[in-house]
A protein has these predicted regions:
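Residue-level recognition of short, well-ordered coil/turn positions
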Residues: 25-26, 108
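Extended, hydrophobic/aromatic-rich amphipathic alpha-helical segments that build helical scaffolds
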Residues: 4-25, 33-41, 82-88
Length: 170
């Protein structure tokens, strides 16, 4: 009885396929997979909701309602924005690291942050997680070789992430 473990959901696969099609990495219909991803995501979360014992399950929307919603969110001029924003929403609080990876890799959804003047160490969103102290204590030679002389910083960008994955506002 705890939260069911998951590696990857069917909705995530549909959103990955939609992204691949939109980028011409593979042949297929990006919009169809995008709509399928929203349908599968909705089904997943309503199925998950039905496992709770603290209250009655919610009534899921009809397939037509989900498809109508998906149609309103599709931006044919920028399919990546539509696809990746919905993928980020799908990951939500259940796969928060995957959601973080999506936005860092793609810049979607567009996120705006204000610098936190009360936080000296981390006034802006982190680019990555630092290595744990045990790694530094027990594997320093390999860690230093991996870092290549660079500092192990919260703000050292990863090679796969966009340098401008969020926008700072004043």
């Amino acid at each position: 009885p705890g939260f069911p473990g998951l590696w990857m959901t069917a909705a995530e696969v549909a959103f990955m396929k939609a992204e691949a099609y939109a980028n011409n990495w593979a042949t297929g219909n990006a919009k169809s997979e995008y709509i399928n991803g929203i349908k599968l995501s909705t089904e997943f979360y309503f199925d998950l909701n039905s496992t709770g014992t603290y209250r009655d399950p919610l009534t899921p929307p009809s397939a037509a309602e989900v498809e109508a919603y998906a149609e309103t969110q599709w931006d044919a001029s920028n399919p990546q924005k539509s696809i990746l924003t919905q993928r980020w929403i799908h990951h939500g609080a259940i796969q928060e690291y995957e959601a973080w990876n999506v936005v860092r890799r793609t810049g979607y959804p567009e996120i705006y942050f204000k610098r936190d003047p009360q936080s000296v160490a981390t006034p802006l969103p982190l680019d990555r997680i630092q290595y744990p102290a045990d790694e530094k204590d027990y594997n320093s030679a390999n860690l230093n070789a991996h870092l290549g002389g660079k500092e192990d910083s919260w703000y050292a960008p990863l090679n796969w992430m966009k340098s401008n994955w969020y926008t700072t506002v004043e």
